[in-house]
Regions:
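N-terminal helix-turn-helix
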Residues: 1-37, 196-204
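Short, structured loop/turn "capping" segments at alpha-beta junctions
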Residues: 104-109, 116-117, 139, 143
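Amphipathic alpha-helical effector-binding/dimerization core
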Residues: 18-112
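Short hinge/gating elements
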Residues: 29, 118-119
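A cytosolic small-molecule/anion-sensing beta-strand core signal
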Residues: 13, 61, 168
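Extended hydrophobic
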Residues: 121-194
Length: 206
């Protein structure tokens, strides 16, 4: 048994194995979120350089987006921070994650308002938020066009597990709006490629 040979498990009796206490001790302090952060961060750093923007990986926690990892491109610092949170209904990552909720979960969220207006572009009407989430799900990406902050423009795509579940989302964020639809498409191509790479890194058990 490879796991036994590597010292990761120990045999308690014939046919029964348990985690090696020494191995468990080494894992103290590691949570699933911490592991995800360590896996994703170096990939985000490469993406940030390629896109020349700040990149994020986020998950949904208590109806808020939590940023588990962030990579900054020089000169493109934005106000977000790792382990910090933003509203989901108006952020690109949040729209992606909300759009992949079950119908009942999404309906519960939509009826949980009110939804504060953060900028002139923030969508706050529950019916319009629902339509925006539907558009996000259909097209496969989320957009924050100055809805969280007047000088913040983001585009995000989902990261799937091998079983088709959404484990999080990655985004490209900049203080400059994309110059053209082509630039947006180019970003999406790279974002989707990286999302697939993260899925592969997580492995078949994810």
């Amino acid at each position: 048994n490879a796991l036994h040979s590597a010292g990761l498990i120990c045999r308690s009796k014939r046919g029964r194995y348990l985690p090696n206490p020494v191995f468990l001790k080494k894992l103290e302090g590691f949570t699933p979120h911490a592991v995800l952060s360590e896996i994703v961060r170096p990939i985000l750093e490469q993406l940030s350089v390629a896109l020349e923007t700040t990149t994020h990986f986020g998950i949904l926690e208590n109806d808020m987006v939590t940023y588990l990892a962030k990579a900054v491109f020089e000169g493109e610092e934005v106000f977000t921070r790792e382990k910090g949170q933003l509203e989901a209904y108006c952020s690109a990552i949040g729209k992606v994650l909300l759009s992949h909720m079950t119908v009942d979960e999404r309906q519960a969220y939509i009826t949980s308002g009110p939804f504060p207006k953060l900028t002139d572009k923030t969508i706050t009407d529950p019916a319009e938020i629902e339509r925006e989430l539907h558009r996000t799900r259909i097209r496969g990406f989320g957009v924050d066009d100055g809805e969280v902050h007047n000088a913040l423009y983001c585009i995000a795509v989902p990261v799937f597990t091998s079983r088709g579940m959404v484990v999080g989302a990655i985004s490209s964020s900049s203080s400059q709006r994309w110059a053209s639809p082509k630039e947006q498409r180019d970003r999406l191509i790279q974002l989707n490629g990286v999302a697939q790479s993260i899925s592969s890194t997580l492995g078949a058990g994810a």
